[in-house]
Amino acid sequence: MAGGKAGKDSGKAKAKAVSRSQRAGLQFPVGRIHRHLKTRTTSHGRVGATAAVYSAAILEYLTAEVLELAGNASKDLKVKRITPRHLQLAIRGDEELDSLIKATIAGGGAIPHIHKSLIGKKGQQKTA
């Protein structure tokens, strides 16, 4: 084998690449989140390797939580498609998510709420 690279890679099969998302057992893209964290920091792109994994895990958990609650809301209304209205009902119905997500949801509508002092007691007659 003239001019060959016989010593290098002699009979070993190259291992298949495993993504960081697969290693962490996540669905969200750890590599992409790491890239976005690097471009949006002021410390010259220095971001720890576990920061992206942790951020991806948090985003995945919050997304799963919101989608589960919105799915329950759509099931209660007997429809199969989640709409912005279902997302709005799910987020505003959960106290912790409501405090976390203060954004206005386009197409979400208004949350029905009647103050307790306006609701009459049972058997109480309205006087005219």
Swiss-Prot record:
Q: Please provide, in alphabetical order, the Gene Ontology terms of the cellular component aspect for this entry.
A: nucleosome; nucleus
User: What is known about what this protein does?
Assistant: Variant histone H2A which replaces conventional H2A in a subset of nucleosomes. Nucleosomes wrap and compact DNA into chromatin, limiting DNA accessibility to the cellular machineries which require DNA as a template. Histones thereby play a central role in transcription regulation, DNA repair, DNA replication and chromosomal stability. DNA accessibility is regulated via a complex set of post-translational modifications of histones, also called histone code, and nucleosome remodeling. May be involved in the formation of constitutive heterochromatin.
Parts of the chain that traverse the membrane: none
Question: In which family does this protein belong, per the annotation?
Answer: Belongs to the histone H2A family.
What is the name of the protein in this document? Answer: Histone H2A.V
Annotated compartments = Nucleus; Chromosome
Q: Which residues carry this modification: N6-lactoyllysine?
A: 12, 14, 116
Disordered: annotated span: 1-23
Q: Mind telling me which PANTHER family this protein's record contains?
A: HISTONE H2A
The organism sits in which domain of life? Answer: Eukaryota
- A single GO molecular function term of this UniProt record: DNA binding
Q: List the disulfide bonds.
A: none
| Species this protein is from | Oryctolagus cuniculus (Rabbit)
